[in-house]
């Protein structure tokens, strides 16, 4: 019996998240990508399932990133706080939906403050 190697698989959330920067008159926008690392076939099926529920994931992420501070958006440590919150929040959502919480990584792939 040969074990299949783990495969990284990504899903770029097709939404630009926008809102107010906490304590300022500024607005922000950011984009998010999530990833899993599991055996190839499972990885493919998992990302396919996430893609089918992407609208729900957008709703969850929107609530998770409300009113970030400028420091959170501009610093490496702050962006890590945001991505950790997204990672934990989405996995908790998947558990509530009866799915395995297999999102291993969350990334902010674009940030703008105006």
Predicted features and spans:
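Flexible, low-complexity charged segments
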Residues: 1-114
């Amino acid at each position: 019996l040969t074990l299949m190697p783990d495969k990284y698989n990504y899903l770029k959330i097709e939404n630009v998240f926008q809102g107010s920067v906490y304590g300022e008159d500024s607005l922000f926008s950011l984009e998010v990508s999530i990833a899993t690392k599991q055996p190839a076939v499972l990885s493919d099926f998992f990302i396919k399932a996430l893609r089918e529920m992407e609208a729900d994931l957008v709703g969850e992420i929107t609530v998770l990133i409300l009113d970030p501070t400028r420091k959170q958006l501009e610093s490496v440590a702050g962006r890590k706080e945001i991505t950790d919150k997204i990672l934990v929040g989405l996995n908790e959502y998947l558990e509530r939906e009866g799915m395995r919480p297999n999102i291993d990584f969350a990334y902010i792939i674009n940030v703008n403050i105006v």
